[in-house]
């Protein structure tokens, strides 16, 4: 009997570095065009979003720099790990995000990749502005103080 594809067993790959290096101004969920071996690798959790970003080319939005590892059982018909992948958006969303992405200092960054309830791969894109060094330090201080408070609350 085959195992059902529930929410619990589907991997969620998050770009934790993006939360540290960027202020997220807006979020958008979009689909991604993948090959079969890429989907299998994603289900195994073999993905790196460290160097990934979104790029607007003409009327399309592309995910560039995402590294989906080759699927070992796909031998001859395997995919190229770092190829650009087309993101699937509605035309209104695409135009709105493309116009905002062309503003100075804004970048499209993939925040996470996951499978929805229907088993389709989705990308959560963020419209982000880079943090300055003092902003990063402030974020680290807040996280440290929150951790200390949580630790103290657990002791009581």
Predicted regions mapped to residue ranges:
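Flexible glycine-rich active-site/ligand-binding loops centered on an Asp-His dyad
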Residues: 130, 136-153
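Short amphipathic alpha-helical patches
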Residues: 62-66, 120-125, 146-147, 151-153
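Basic Arg/Gly/Lys-rich low-complexity intrinsically disordered segments
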Residues: 1-16, 135, 142
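C-terminal low-complexity, charged extensions that often adopt amphipathic alpha-helices
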Residues: 107-112, 150-152, 156
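Beta-rich strand-turn-strand
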Residues: 89-126, 130-132
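Ribosome large-subunit tunnel/peptidyl-transferase-proximal elements
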Residues: 10-106
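Switch/connector loops and helix/strand junctions flanking conserved nucleotide-binding motifs
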Residues: 71-73, 122, 133-135
């Amino acid at each position: 009997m085959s195992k059902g594809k529930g929410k619990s067993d589907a991997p969620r790959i998050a770009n934790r570095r993006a939360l540290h290096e960027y202020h997220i101004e807006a979020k958008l969920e979009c689909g991604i065009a993948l090959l079969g071996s890429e989907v299998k690798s994603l289900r195994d959790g073999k993905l790196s979003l460290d160097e990934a970003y979104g790029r607007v080319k003409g009327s399309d939005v592309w995910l560039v720099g995402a590294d989906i590892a080759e699927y070992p059982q796909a031998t001859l018909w395997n995919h190229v790990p770092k190829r650009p992948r087309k993101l699937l958006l509605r035309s209104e969303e695409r135009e709105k995000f493309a116009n905002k992405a062309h503003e100075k200092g804004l970048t499209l960054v993939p925040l996470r990749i996951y499978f929805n309830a229907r088993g389709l791969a989705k990308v959560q894109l963020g419209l982000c502005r880079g943090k300055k060094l003092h902003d990063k330090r402030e974020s680290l201080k807040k996280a440290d103080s929150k951790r200390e408070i949580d630790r103290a609350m657990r002791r009581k």
